[in-house]
Amino acid sequence: MKRSLQALYCQLLSFLLTLALTEALVFAAQEPSPRESLQVSPSGTIPGTMVTASLSSTRHSSMVATPASVVTPTPHPDGPSSQATAPMATTTPHLDGHPPTNTISTIMATASTPHSEGSLSTGPLPAAMATTSSHSEGRAPGETAPTILLTKPGEATSRPPTAPSRATIRRPPRPPGSSRKGAGSSPRPIPAAPSGHAGRKDGQRGRNQSSTHLGQKRPLGKIFQIYKGNFTGSVEPDPSTFTPRNPLWGYSSSPQPQTVAATSAPSRTSWVPPTTPLVPVEDKPSLSRADQGGGSTFTSQGGEPDATAASGTPASQQRAPVPSQRPHGDPQDGSSHSDSWLTVTPGTSRPPSTNSGVFAATTGPIQAAFDASVSVPSEGLPQGTSLAPQAPAHPTWASESTVSQAEEKAVATPTPTMMGRVPSPLSTVVSTATGNFLNRLVPAGTWKPGTAGNISHVAEGDKPQQRATICLSKMDIAWVILAISVPISSCSVLLTVCCLRRKKKPANPENSLSYWNNAITMDYFSKHAVELPREIQSLETSEDQLSEPRSPANGDYRDTGMVLVNPFCQETLFVGNDQVSEI
C-alpha cells in the first residue's frame, strides 16, 4: 500500500513539473523580443522643447528631442529617414544603390531603420542624441548632409560662467558601433582634409566670421543647438527681446560647448571629449541616465567633416570656435543650401527667432501632455493636425543680413501642438505637428508611415506589427501529449489497483484446507457408527478365559474380535476372525 502511494505521488509530481515546464515554454515563446519592446523616455524633468527643421527638397535630416521634450520629426521629401528607438549604433542605408558613407558616433547610439516615402524619424531616447541622415534620391554619396547635435545642461542655468579646466575634462566612452580616431583630450575637433577647393574657402570663411563675434554674451539657459551644412545665418533668442541680436554660429564668448565632435572621413568618425567639467560623463558602456549631460552625440554623412558643437550648462562664456569649421566635400552646399544653427531656450516663454532652413522653438514650461494626434507628412509636405499656415522656405541664396531681418520680422502663429507658444515665422516652414513626434513608444522596425501617434495614449504606443508565433513541430506536440497523458493514465491505473486491494472478499471456510479436513472427518463419523463386537461373551466364558490374556503380547488382534477404529483414515478396519488388520 505504501509503495503504491509513493508511486502515485511520484507520478503526480512528474505531471505537475511537466505542466509547469510546458507553460514556461509557451510563455517564453509568447513574450515579445527585445526589438519589439517599447522604449519609454523620461518626461517631466524639464519643460518640453520641440525643435523642427524644414529642409530643402534634396536633403534629409533627423531631429532630436531633449530627454524630457517631445520628439520632433523632420518632414523628409520622398526618401527614407532614420528612426532612433533602441540603444544601438547602425548606419542609415542609402537610396539608389549608394554605398554607405556615413558613420554614427553616439553615446546613446541610434538605431536607423529605412522606411518608405513620407516616413519620418523620431528620437525618443532618454539621452541627448542625434540620428544620421540618409541620402535622398538625387543626392551624391559624398555630398554633405545635415548634422544635428543636442546637449542637455546638467546644472541650473543661473550659474555664473566659469572657465573649465582641462584637467576636469573627461573623455566620453566610445560608442559600440563606431570606429573613431579620437582627438585626444583637446576640446577642439580634428577636421579632415577638405575634399575640394570650395571646402577650404568655406573653412576660412567660417573662421573669419567666428572671429567677428567675440565679446558677445549668450543668454544663460538650457540651450539646444542644432546646425547642419553651411552656416549662412543664425538665430539666438535674447532674454529681454524677441528678436535675435546677431548670428549665432561663430560665437567665441558663448557658453562652452558640452560636446565638440567632428567626422573626418566617410567611414570613420572623430570624437572629441566634452569641454564642460560641470557634469562629467561616467565611463559606462550603457549611459542610461540622461542627467549626466555629457552624452551629446552627432552623426554626419561620410566624406564631409561636419564639426558639431552643443552648448550644455553654461560653464563659461567662451565657446570653442568649432562651429567655424565648415563642412567640406560638396562645392554646391555653400551656394545652394542655406543652413544654420538652431538655438532653443526652453526656460523662457517668448516667441523664438528663426533662420533659413532651421526652426528655433522656445516653448517654455509647456504642459507634459500634448493633446494632439499628429499625422505623418506625405511626399515631403509637412502637415500639422491643425494645418498651421506654412510659410515658404527661406531662399537658399539669402545672406546673413536678410536672414536677420527676416528673423526680426517673424510673425507668431501658434499651433496647437506647441500650446500656442511656438510662432510660425515667415522665413521657415513651421509644421511642428508633422509626424508622430509625440509618440515616444514606437518600437524599432514597427513604424509605418501614415499612422498617427495619439498623445493621450503615450504608454501604449504603436502596437508591434510582428506578433510572436509558436511553431511546434510534430515531436513537440507528441511530447506535450505524452507529458499530459502518461501521468494521468498511470495515476488512474494506480488508483484502480489500490481500490481493488482495499475491497477484500469475505472469508469463505471452503477456501481453507483445515475446513475440508474437519468436514471430511466429521461427515465420516456421522455416517458410520463404530461397530461393536460381534458376539458377547458370557461371564462363564470370560471367566473361563481369565487365564488367557485379553490382548496379545505382540499386538496381534486377529483372533480377539476387536475393532480398531482410526478416525483419520479413510477406511475402518474391522478385525474379524477372517480379517487381518495391519496398521
UniProtKB/Swiss-Prot annotation:
Q: Name one GO biological process term.
A: postsynaptic density organization
Which parts of the sequence are annotated with region: Disordered?
71-360, 376-404
Q: What is this protein called?
A: Transmembrane protein 108
| Gene it is expressed from | TMEM108
Span list, region Interacts with DST (isoform 1): 180-413
Query: Could you give one GO CC term from the UniProt record?
Result: somatodendritic compartment
| Residue ranges of the region described as Interaction with CYFIP2 | 498-583
As for subcellular location, the record says: Membrane; Postsynaptic density; Endosome membrane; Cell projection, Axon
- Kindly give the membrane topology term recorded for this protein: Multi-pass membrane protein
- Ranges for region Interacts with SH3GL2: 31-176
